[in-house]
C-alpha cells in the first residue's frame, strides 16, 4: 500500500495543477459542457454544497476518477448555495440532480432517495477484499441506519468546532512564554482580562447573522453544558430520560430531565453570561460584534481590518477545522498577513468541580486537565473517577453530524454513481482530497495521511487539529439520532423573555434573563406543552 501511495503522489501533484481554482470548466467536470468529456457515453450530475473546506478537494477526486478510474463516465459538478433549498427540491422531486453532497439531514426520505445497502457491500476500487462498509466507522453505520436500510452515506469528516487562537498576536501583546492556553473557564476569563488591558478582545460573535447560523459560540455553550452533565447525562437529557429510582425512563408527563439538570443549566448559562457581559469592568466580547459576519470575525482573529479600517483584534475565536482553508486566499492576495493561528482543546467549565468532590478548586482542576492531556501527574488526593470526568470533558468537541452523499430516486446511471461513491471511500481518493485541504482528512473513511504521503509538511494549524482529533469525543449538536428532542423542541435552556436573536447577542446587549432566572424560564416553557408533545411523538412512533 505504501509503495502504491508513493507512486500516486506524482499523479496528485499533476492533479493539483488542474483541480485548483474556483468555478468554471477546469477539466474537472465543473460545467455542463466540458469539452474534454463531451463525448463520454455516460454522465451524471453531482450537486455539492461548498462549505468551509471549499470544493477543490471534490474537483480533484472527480478529475482523478474520470481520468484514471472510469474513462466512460462524465461527472458534471453543480454548486448549491443553500442546503435547505436543495433538500426541498429533493423532497418535492422538482429540478433535482442525480447525486448530492448536502450538509443537512436527509432522514425519512426513503420515498425520494435511492437505497444504498448494496453500495455498502461493494468492493472498494484498488483495495481487494475491502468493502465500502469496512471503511465506515460502526458508529456512523448505526447513526444512518433506518429500519435496516441506508439512504445516506457519511461524506466529509467530522472535525468539529473548537477554540482557535492567534499565537502571533498573543506573543506580541503578552510576550512569548509569558502566557498559557486556558485550561478552565476561570483561566479563560483571567486571560481575557489581561488582553483587554492590552487593547485586545478575548473573542467575538457573528452578530450580523441574526438567525444564529454563523454564531458558533452557541455550539461552545452546549459543549460546556455537556461537560456539566457528562456525555451520558447529555444523551439522557436530550432523549428526555430521567432517573426514576435507578431506572432511566422517558419523561412522559413532565420534563423531569430538565429538573435533574438544573445545576448544569444554571452554571452553563452563567459562563455564557460572563463571556458576553464581561466582569470586573473588563469586556471579553468585541465591541463591534453586533455588526460582524463570520468572515469579519475571522479577519479580526487574523489581525485584519473591518470594513477597510483597522480594528481591535480578537485573540480567540470559536471556529471550525476549516478555518485555515477559509483564510488561505486572503493571505495569498495580501489582504491579511500570515498569522500563526492554531486550534486548542476545550477549556473545562470550572463549575465541573461540583461533580468531582476530590477536586477542591480551580488550580487543582487545571492540574487535572494537564494530567488529562498527558502533561503531568495526577494531583495528590484526586481520584481516578474524578480524573475520568475531567478527561471526558476536556476531549469534548462540538459537531453537526449531518454531511452526506445521497442519490435521488429518479437519478440516471445509478450504477455509475454507486461505483463513484465506492471510489470515494478508497485511500486513493482520501489522499487526493487531503492534498487539497492542507492535509486534513476531509473524506470520512478512516484514512489518515502522513506528511510523506502528502508530499508536504503539516502547518501548525493542521497539526493542532490532528492533536485534538486523536482523542476527540463528539458532542453532536444536530442530534438527529434523538428524535424525541425534536418532537419537544428541546434545548439546554429556554429564555421566554426574548423573541429572536442569539444567546450571545441577547446577553451582550443585556436583553436576556440572568443565570438565576434561566432555570425557571426553561422549566415553565417546556412543561406547559410537554405531556401533549410526548404523547404525539409516541403516536407517531406507533407506541
Which residues does each predicted region cover?
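Extracytoplasmic/periplasmic substrate-recognition and gating elements
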Residues: 74-76, 148, 308, 312, ...
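Periplasmic solute-binding protein
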Residues: 108-121, 138-180, 189-191, 206-252, ...
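Conserved C-terminal helix/tail region of periplasmic/extracytoplasmic solute-binding proteins
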Residues: 430, 444-543
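Glycine-centered hinge/linker elements that transmit conformational signals in sensory
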Residues: 191-192, 233-296, 341-352, 357-382
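Positively charged n-region of N-terminal signal peptides that target proteins for export
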Residues: 1-4
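Hinge/lid segment of periplasmic solute-binding proteins
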Residues: 102-161, 189, 344, 354-386, ...
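Conserved N-terminal structural module of periplasmic/extracytoplasmic solute-binding proteins
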Residues: 6-7, 17-109, 124-132, 177-178, ...
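Pocket-flanking alpha-helical
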Residues: 59, 81-118, 130-153, 163, ...
Amino acid at each position: 500500500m505504501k509503495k502504491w501511495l508513493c507512486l500516486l503522489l506524482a499523479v496528485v501533484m499533476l492533479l493539483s495543477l488542474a483541480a485548483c481554482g474556483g468555478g468554471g470548466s477546469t477539466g474537472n467536470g465543473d460545467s455542463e459542457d466540458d469539452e474534454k468529456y463531451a463525448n463520454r457515453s455516460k454522465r451524471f450530475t453531482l450537486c455539492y454544497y461548498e462549505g468551509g473546506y471549499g470544493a477543490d478537494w471534490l474537483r480533484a477526486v472527480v478529475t482523478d476518477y474520470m481520468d484514471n478510474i472510469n474513462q466512460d463516465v462524465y461527472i458534471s459538478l453543480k454548486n448549491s448555495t443553500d442546503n435547505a433549498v436543495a433538500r426541498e427540491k429533493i423532497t418535492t422531486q422538482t429540478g433535482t440532480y442525480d447525486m448530492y453532497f448536502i450538509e443537512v439531514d436527509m432522514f425519512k426520505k426513503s420515498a425520494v432517495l435511492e437505497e444504498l445497502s448494496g453500495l455498502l457491500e461493494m468492493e472498494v476500487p484498488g483495495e481487494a477484499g475491502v468493502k465500502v462498509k469496512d471503511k465506515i466507522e460502526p458508529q456512523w453505520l448505526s447513526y444512518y441506519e433506518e429500519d435496516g436500510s441506508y439512504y445516506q452515506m457519511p461524506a466529509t469528516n467530522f472535525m468539529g468546532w473548537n477554540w482557535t487562537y492567534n499565537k502571533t498576536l498573543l506573543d506580541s501583546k503578552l510576550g512569548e512564554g509569558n502566557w498559557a492556553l486556558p485550561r478552565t473557564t476561570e483561566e479563560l476569563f483571567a486571560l481575557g482580562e489581561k488582553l483587554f488591558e492590552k487593547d485586545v478582545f478575548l473573542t467575538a460573535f457573528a452578530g450580523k447573522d441574526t438567525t444564529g447560523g454563523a454564531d458558533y459560540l452557541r455550539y461552545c455553550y452546549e459543549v460546556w453544558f455537556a461537560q456539566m452533565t457528562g456525555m451520558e447525562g447529555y444523551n439522557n437529557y436530550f432523549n428526555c430520560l430521567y432517573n426514576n429510582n435507578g431506572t432511566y425512563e422517558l419523561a412522559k408527563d413532565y420534563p423531569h430531565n430538565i429538573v435533574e439538570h438544573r445545576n448544569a443549566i444554571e452554571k452553563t448559562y452563567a459562563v455564557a453570561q460572563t463571556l458576553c457581559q464581561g466582569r470586573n469592568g473588563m469586556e471579553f466580547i468585541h465591541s463591534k460584534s453586533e455588526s460582524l459576519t463570520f468572515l469579519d470575525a475571522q479577519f479580526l482573529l487574523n489581525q485584519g481590518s473591518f470594513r477597510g479600517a483597522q480594528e481591535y483584534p480578537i485573540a480567540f475565536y470559536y471556529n471550525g477545522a476549516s478555518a485555515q482553508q477559509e483564510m488561505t486566499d486572503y493571505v495569498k492576495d495580501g489582504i491579511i498577513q500570515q498569522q500563526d493561528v492554531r486550534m486548542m482543546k476545550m477549556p473545562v467549565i470550572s463549575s465541573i468541580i461540583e461533580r468531582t468532590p476530590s477536586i477542591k478548586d480551580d488550580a487543582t482542576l487545571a492540574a487535572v486537565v494537564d494530567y488529562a492531556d498527558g502533561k503531568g501527574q495526577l494531583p495528590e488526593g484526586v481520584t481516578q473517577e474524578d480524573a475520568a470526568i475531567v478527561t471526558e470533558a476536556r476531549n469534548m468537541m462540538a459537531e453537526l453530524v449531518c454531511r452526506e452523499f445521497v442519490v435521488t430516486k429518479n437519478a440516471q446511471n445509478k450504477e455509475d454513481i454507486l461505483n463513484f461513491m465506492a471510489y470515494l471511500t478508497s485511500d486513493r481518493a482520501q489522499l487526493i482530497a487531503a492534498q487539497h485541504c492542507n492535509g486534513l482528512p476531509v473524506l470520512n473513511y478512516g484514512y489518515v495521511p502522513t506528511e510523506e504521503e502528502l508530499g508536504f509538511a503539516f502547518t501548525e494549524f493542521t497539526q493542532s487539529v490532528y492533536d485534538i482529533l486523536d482523542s476527540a469525543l463528539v458532542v453532536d449538536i444536530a442530534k438527529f439520532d434523538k428524535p424525541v428532542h425534536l418532537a419537544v423542541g428541546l434545548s439546554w435552556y429556554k429564555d421566554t423573555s426574548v423573541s429572536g436573536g442569539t444567546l450571545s447577542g441577547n446577553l451582550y446587549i443585556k436583553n436576556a434573563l440572568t443565570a438565576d432566572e434561566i432555570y425557571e424560564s426553561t422549566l415553565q416553557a417546556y412543561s406547559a406543552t410537554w405531556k401533549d408533545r410526548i404523547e404525539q411523538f409516541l403516536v407517531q412512533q406507533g407506541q
